[in-house]
A protein has these predicted regions:
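Structure-specific nucleic-acid interaction/processing domains
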Residues: 1-141
Length: 141
């Protein structure tokens, strides 16, 4: 179950591309900060008599997602999903917004130096023009 503003969140809204999240291991309170898209592109075979492959946008596996961290994935296998809480920090309208807010949250929380986090890397490339509509009123919960 994902939570947003402490309420269960189950619907991928069309206006949003994805979200920035915090996954917390409940026994140790260690966390992982990441991002996940609501949508993914799927390549379909060409229509009969055509040669060009088709692209389709489908809902991603976000409901079942527990992050890209190998450590978190292993803990999930060992202890089960009930040992984790998944919180959505920001709903994002673009991939650039997701990338920017994920990196901002990771730097603000000092995830690479603070032992309370599983994050092992901060990887981000965002161009200023891609986030012009983003204002500094994004506050994490």
């Amino acid at each position: 179950m994902w939570y947003y503003n402490d309420e269960p969140y189950e619907i991928a809204l069309g206006e949003y591309q994805g979200f920035v999240y915090c996954i917390t291991e409940l026994t140790t309170n260690k966390m992982y900060i990441g991002k996940k898209g609501f949508w993914s592109k799927k390549t379909l075979p060409p229509l009969k008599g055509k040669t060009r492959k088709r692209r389709s946008v489908v809902e991603s596996d976000w409901m079942k997602y527990y992050g890209s961290s190998e450590v978190v994935k292993q803990l999930l296998l060992e202890h089960g999903a009930d040992n984790f809480r998944r919180d959505i920090l920001y709903l994002c309208k673009s991939k650039a917004e997701m990338g920017y807010l994920e990196a901002k949250e990771q730097f603000d929380r000092n995830v690479l130096l603070d032992d309370r986090y599983y994050n092992g890397i901060i990887n981000c490339k965002v161009h200023r023009n891609h986030i012009k509509g983003l204002h500094s009123n994004h506050n994490s919960i």
